[in-house]
Amino acid sequence: MKYWAVLLTVFNRKEKTLECLSRLFDQLPVEDLQIDVFLTDDGCTDGTAEAVENLFPSVQILKGNGDLFWNRGMLMAWKAAADSRDYDAYLWLNDDTFLYEETLTSLQRAVKDTEGKAIIVGATEDANHSKLTYGGRLREGMIPNPTGELRPVEYFNGNIVLVPQFVFRQLGYLDDYFTHSKGDFDYGLRAKKAGLQIYQIGKVLGECDEHPTIDKWCNPNVPFAQRWNMLHRPNGMPPRETFYFEKRHYGIIVACLHYLTVHIRCLFPKWWIRKQQPKRN
């Protein structure tokens, strides 16, 4: 029997969270697998925690302070799980991601095929099944099209990610320097630097709609004061965290350049958008 801890962090998305958990528990039982769910409630005010406790009493709910966001909320859940048991693997799951049937079985098979020594990632698609939204990432940032076989990737989105015990013992937890985003990308890039492998499963494992393509911090239709505020929010493009990430993985020159361009995009979003558009003959 293998034991996995499923990790989530949630904030005011009650219906999506309940659907996410329903899709997860609907897959049970799975032969030779037992799961425990650790969920960080980061200050929900919409009744999410109460609904989860009522409908899924086995879920262990941890109370955040409302300022954890994704990365630190996942970190809280992960530490609680690791403190409670020496799990064989840890499954990251976003609360807006709805697993397809046999996802757990597919992950099991991938772990066996890689001898439990690689991070396993699942791709997601939009509700219309028309495009890939999240998953493993190639060097250029693209999500590889699932073709039936395990596909090596360079890093990943944290929607569906299985971290086996072998990997956890080498890499440890998500880096708590990050508040919201970049923690998942950072974990993948650290894994590659450590010589560990990352594979995306050869079929789409779930549904998750893509977030808006233009963030508020660089959207020309948003007033400057709001853009500046959103730039520095954890779920914007916080310059210090961005610099830390870029310096760690791409060097000081790239980090300094991107620190500058992030501010230019916030200050002059229309000019930046025009600058990035391909020129026509």
Question: What are the roles of these predicted feature ranges?
Answer:
Residues 98-134:
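Conserved donor NDP-sugar-binding/catalytic core segment of glycosyltransferases
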Residues 143-163, 230:
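A recurrent flexible, glycine/aromatic-enriched loop bordering the glycosyltransferase active site
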Residues 86-98:
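Short beta-strand-to-loop acidic/aromatic patch adjacent to the donor-nucleotide binding site
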Residues 4-20, 27, 40:
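A conserved hydrophobic helix/loop-capping motif in glycosyltransferases and polysaccharide synthases
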Residues 23-33:
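Short, acidic, metal-binding catalytic loop of nucleotide-sugar glycosyltransferases
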Residues 40-50:
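A conserved acidic beta->alpha catalytic loop
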Residues 161-163, 167-172, 177-204:
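A short, conserved alpha-helix in the catalytic core of glycosyltransferases
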Residues 213-214, 218-281:
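Non-catalytic, C-terminal membrane-associated alpha-helical segments of glycosyltransferases
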